């Protein structure tokens, strides 16, 4: 029988380390006794005291106890819960340094996963404000027996526990400082321990809260929820099962929407996918339009189109746009948005873009000169493998995962006959390591 050497027990003594670099997740990298240690809360160039959290085979993990020599990029976190709450990971790093980290991450991912490099890096897209930007969020809810209270918020860093938050600096102001009040509201309901989450979705004029409940609500419960909505000017929705069970409780006839360039009203349900950062989204859509260089009457394919966030602005610019989406509800909302905005040059179809080949569909055989892709984190490998068959000359790819974008870029450049003209970072999620990326591809050979 093989005998494996026992790992050394975790030292409880503070350890000193010099921080050499940052991981893509924003942890400091150090070497102690010849072994790599990833240290939460530490920045490059700093000397810190830290304690070990856990030992792994090839690396250890730790957390800062004291910063002996701070880095020039270190700033005071605005949120009192930073370091405990897992919602943000970079509030201690200046916004300029955060952006630099994201740019380095994207460059490295392109090289590592795609073996490609853009001909030119675009200047990063950033918003004007770094606080209260989060228009969309999913809040955890938990009755904690030991504290005899209901907690509402994000999970603690590295834990499944809900952090006890007095407020959130990055959440939309309509909700950011209502977290304790939401906890008190749920504590007053008959099913206080059977509500696992609240979905937050803010429009331009109002904010909606979706209460997920695992058991039926009483009349008294719904009255409490309505009173809360009235007091704080919030739309209240209930969800007793899957996404199809979401229904508006109060006020009757209410809807959520946001404006695009003052010309379009985009209507959505609170559980629909919409971009987290409204200001940056507007800048992103504008840059996509610039890169695609739309000419009147040009046929454009919008894959993973959602409610039409890009489709409708493309139609306003004069393109004949076909939006494709795999979710029937989102397709219905996209069609409704085109009708609501009186656009007759935007069409929508439903298809599983990552499930099977789709070039045989009628809409795919009609031909497109340009295409836009905005896939989920898993990327769009099957879709990009079919781009050259469609003879698409120019592609803009918007991604929330630089690793899968890099993989798909490698496919387009190395096998589908495209060149990677431009790429750039979009800072959709300040104070976190999440990074949105945009890339432009042009066809180099005819098929």
From Swiss-Prot:
Amino-acid positions noted as binding S-adenosyl-L-methionine in the UniProt annotation, renumbered to this chain: 275, 304, 309, 325, 352, 374
UniProt: [4Fe-4S] cluster binding residues: 79, 85, 88, 168
EC number from the UniProt entry: 2.1.1.190
SUPFAM superfamilies associated with the record: Nucleic acid-binding proteins, S-adenosyl-L-methionine-dependent methyltransferases
Active site (record annotation): 400
Catalysed conversion reaction: uridine(1939) in 23S rRNA + S-adenosyl-L-methionine = 5-methyluridine(1939) in 23S rRNA + S-adenosyl-L-homocysteine + H(+)
Keywords annotated in UniProt: 4Fe-4S, Iron, Iron-sulfur, Metal-binding, Methyltransferase, rRNA processing, S-adenosyl-L-methionine, Transferase
Gene Ontology biological process terms, A to Z: rRNA base methylation
EC class (word): transferase
GO MF, one annotated term: iron ion binding
Domain annotation TRAM: ranges: 7-66
PANTHER family: 23S RRNA (URACIL(1939)-C(5))-METHYLTRANSFERASE RLMD, RNA M5U METHYLTRANSFERASE
Family as reported in the entry's similarity comment: Belongs to the class I-like SAM-binding methyltransferase superfamily. RNA M5U methyltransferase family. RlmD subfamily.
Role played: Catalyzes the formation of 5-methyl-uridine at position 1939 (m5U1939) in 23S rRNA.
Name of the protein: 23S rRNA (uracil(1939)-C(5))-methyltransferase RlmD
The organism's taxonomic lineage, starting at the top: Bacteria, Pseudomonadati, Pseudomonadota, Gammaproteobacteria, Chromatiales
């Amino acid at each position: 029988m093989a005998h494996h050497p026992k790992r050394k027990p975790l030292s409880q003594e503070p350890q000193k380390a010099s921080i050499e670099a940052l991981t893509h997740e924003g942890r400091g990298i150090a070497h102690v006794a010849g072994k790599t240690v990833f240290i939460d809360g530490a920045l490059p160039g700093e000397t810190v005291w830290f304690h070990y959290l856990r030992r792994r085979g090839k690396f250890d993990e730790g957390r800062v106890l004291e910063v002996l020599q701070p880095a020039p990029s270190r700033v005071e976190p605005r949120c009192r819960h930073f370091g405990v709450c897992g919602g943000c990971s970079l509030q201690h790093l200046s916004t300029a340094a955060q952006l630099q980290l994201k740019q380095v991450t994207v460059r490295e991912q392109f090289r590592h996963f795609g073996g490609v490099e853009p001909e030119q890096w675009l200047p990063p897209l950033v918003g004007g404000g770094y606080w209260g930007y989060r228009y969309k969020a999913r809040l955890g809810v938990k009755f904690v027996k030991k504290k005899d209270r209901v907690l509402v918020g994000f999970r603690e860093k590295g834990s499944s526990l809900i952090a006890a938050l007095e407020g959130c600096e990055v959440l939309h102001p309509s909700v950011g400082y209502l977290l304790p009040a939401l906890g008190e509201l749920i504590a007053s309901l008959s099913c206080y321990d059977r509500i696992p989450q609240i979905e937050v979705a803010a429009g331009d004029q109002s904010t909606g809260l979706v209460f997920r409940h695992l058991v039926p609500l009483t009349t008294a419960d719904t009255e409490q929820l309505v009173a809360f909505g009235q007091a704080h000017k919030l739309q209240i929705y209930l969800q007793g099962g899957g996404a199809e069970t979401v229904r508006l409780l109060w006020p009757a006839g209410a809807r959520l929407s946001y404006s695009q360039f003052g010309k379009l009203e985009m209507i959505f349900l609170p559980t629909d996918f919409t971009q987290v950062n409204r200001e940056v989204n507007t800048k992103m859509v504008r840059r996509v339009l610039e890169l695609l260089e739309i000419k009147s009457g040009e046929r454009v394919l919008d894959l993973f189109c959602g409610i039409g966030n890009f489709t409708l602005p493309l139609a306003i610019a004069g393109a004949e746009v076909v939006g494709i989406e795999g979710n029937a509800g989102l397709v219905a909302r996209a069609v409704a948005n085109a009708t609501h905005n009186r656009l007759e040059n935007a069409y929508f179809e439903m298809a599983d873009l990552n499930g099977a080949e789709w070039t045989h569909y009628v809409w795919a055989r009609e031909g497109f000169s340009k295409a836009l892709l905005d896939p989920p984190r898993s990327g769009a490998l099957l879709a990009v493998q079919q781009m050259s068959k469609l003879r698409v000359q120019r592609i803009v790819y918007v991604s929330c995962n630089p690793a899968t974008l890099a993989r798909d870029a490698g496919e387009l450049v190395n096998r589908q006959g495209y060149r990677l003209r431009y790429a750039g970072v979009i800072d959709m999620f300040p104070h976190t390591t999440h990074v949105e990326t945009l890339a432009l591809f042009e066809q180099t050979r005819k098929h």
